[in-house]
Amino acid sequence: MQHKKVQMNLYLAFRLLIGTFFLSHGLQKLFGFFGGVDGNGGAVNLFSMFGLAGLIEFIGGLFIFLGLFTSIVAFIASLEMLTAYFMFHVPTGGILPLMQQFNGEPPILFFAAFLVLIAFGAGKWGLERKLLGREIWHQKR
């Protein structure tokens, strides 16, 4: 029983960290936080591909952090990460992240994290479970 409690606590920390980091990328793109996209606080045009990415990252990161529709949001976010990787990172140096000019590791690592979130959902401490009594796509554990 103690082992399962440790697993649940570690998974909660994992979900909160992924949500926070993904949200921070959305804040950077949409509102120019953390130096913005240009290093000087610049934000992207909301009605552009980067604006759509910022919305997915901002809303998706918030929902993942809160544990709200986690699997669905993680699925959408995983598609964004694959798109970012193949459209913007691979053309700068090949399929391997270390060969790329613009560091392709973050989208691949986010993609892997989202696969875990798709598989396991929000977990015990997700807001979705509190509001709906269960998680969509997952049975109560």
Segments the model singles out, each with a brief description of its role:
Residues K29-G39:
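Membrane-interface helix-loop junction between the first two transmembrane segments
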